[in-house]
Amino acid sequence: MIKPRTPPGVLELLPREQIAFQRMLDVIRRNYERFGFLPVETPVFELSDVLLTKSGGETERQVYFVQSTGTLANAAESGATRLPELALRFDLTVPLARYVAEYEHVLAFPFRRYQIQRVYRGERAQRGRFREFYQCDIDVIGKQTLSIRYDAEVLAVIHAVFSELGIGDFQVQLNNRKVLRGFLESQGVRDGELQLAVLREVDKLDKRGVLDVRDTLIGQGFGIPAAQVENILTFVATRSTSHADALARLDALIQDSGPEAHDMLRQGVAELREVLTLVNVLGVPEHAYRLNFSIARGLDYYTGTVYETALINHPQIGSICSGGRYENLANHYTQSKLPGVGISIGLTRLFWQLRDAGLIDGIAESSVQAMVVLMDEATLDDALDIARRLRIGGINTEVQMEAKKLSKQFQYASRAGIRFVVLAGDDERARGVVAVKDLTREQQFEIPREELASTLQVELEQAKVM
């Protein structure tokens, strides 16, 4: 016999954990829709030449290619060495770029989309790293231009999602790449490629530490003078403590730079100021975000606002949501300029980390809210009728289809995490009531049959409030 097992790099859950995962996914979807984002799904596989048009190196080495056995045999016979025609998507951004470019003539801009689907990467299997995982993305895409105001709205979406998820205190770290690049200009780092390389190093500060990054920037690969490196590291250590402090630090940055401040720096500061002002109007509490000049995001296509979100009491988990502003989403697929701003939540990794940290326990019981006991074979019709009435009343209900011992049926309900067990023996039927055992509160009570569904609904709603 073959030993049943899953391939490495996948997260497979038992039902109660899957329910918790699904509820988190539902919260994310609900909040995305609440802010007016529209659902999009793209195929799990794309044409290789389309998917990989702007990738290479590490990304291409992690791609899963798809090939039918017939095509594989033909390629072997002909000695062909080209890439297979199809490949599994490795993120949702490239498929979005293809999608918007393909349908730009029928889409309404600004195009607000959310996408919640699995993606695939051939990463080395190790603890906490997945080859198949859910990404939950939103993006606002403009045509030619896109107001900076959307950047503030995206931050409000982050706040709404994680407030409802209830997984702990969190904070959004906010920055603007133009501020970083403008400051680098003031320090004599003017070459565009060198600036991007410096930003990638800055993005590694939390993992590698200040000393390591300092040595790298001073070293032969970069050759930046030590004094300028110190200025850069001091600058990226800036953190705001409140909304007013964030605005004050932006003012101070322009004042300290004087009349020679680079235009890019001024533009980045102006954009951050507008985002901060609107975030306040949108009702995001000031403790939920702060200015952090070290946030760069390692991906080079970000050009303006950048976000990273972390749990305050669990910093070891790292970023739980990130994203930013980009100037041209689909330049490889269309001549139209399509600027945008968006974020992504890697839900699979986040769930795994929360479970590993013990933060998932107690989030979910069964999705079945009530179970109707089968007292004996003669009461099957009555049990099915009770279940039907409960379902009509909005209660997720299961019926025991075999008349096992009551203790066995109760044991099943307990192990399955079902809260209410409904019984109707001869006495209860004669009096027009049912007996209900609340396994959570360890209480038993009787309810008139016609009030059963509404009463259980009230109990379930009260449990949500508690």
From Swiss-Prot:
Gene3D superfamilies per the UniProt record, alphabetical: Anticodon-binding domain (3.40.50.800), Bira Bifunctional Protein, Domain 2 (3.30.930.10)
GO cellular component, one term: cytoplasm
Entry keywords, A to Z: Aminoacyl-tRNA synthetase, ATP-binding, Cytoplasm, Ligase, Nucleotide-binding, Protein biosynthesis
Catalytic function, reaction form: tRNA(His) + L-histidine + ATP = L-histidyl-tRNA(His) + AMP + diphosphate + H(+)
Principal subcellular localisation of the protein: cytoplasm
InterPro entries: aa-tRNA-synth_II, aa-tRNA-synth_II/BPL/LPL, Anticodon-bd, Anticodon-bd_dom_sf, His-tRNA-ligase, HisRS-like_core, HisRS/HisZ, HisRS_anticodon
EC number: 6.1.1.21
EC main group: ligase
Domain of life of the source: Bacteria
Molecular function in Gene Ontology: ATP binding; histidine-tRNA ligase activity
Subcellular location: Cytoplasm
GO biological process: histidyl-tRNA aminoacylation
Subunit structure: Homodimer.
PANTHER family reported in the protein's UniProt record: HISTIDINE--TRNA LIGASE, HISTIDYL-TRNA SYNTHETASE
UniProt record similarity statement: Belongs to the class-II aminoacyl-tRNA synthetase family.
Protein name: Histidine--tRNA ligase
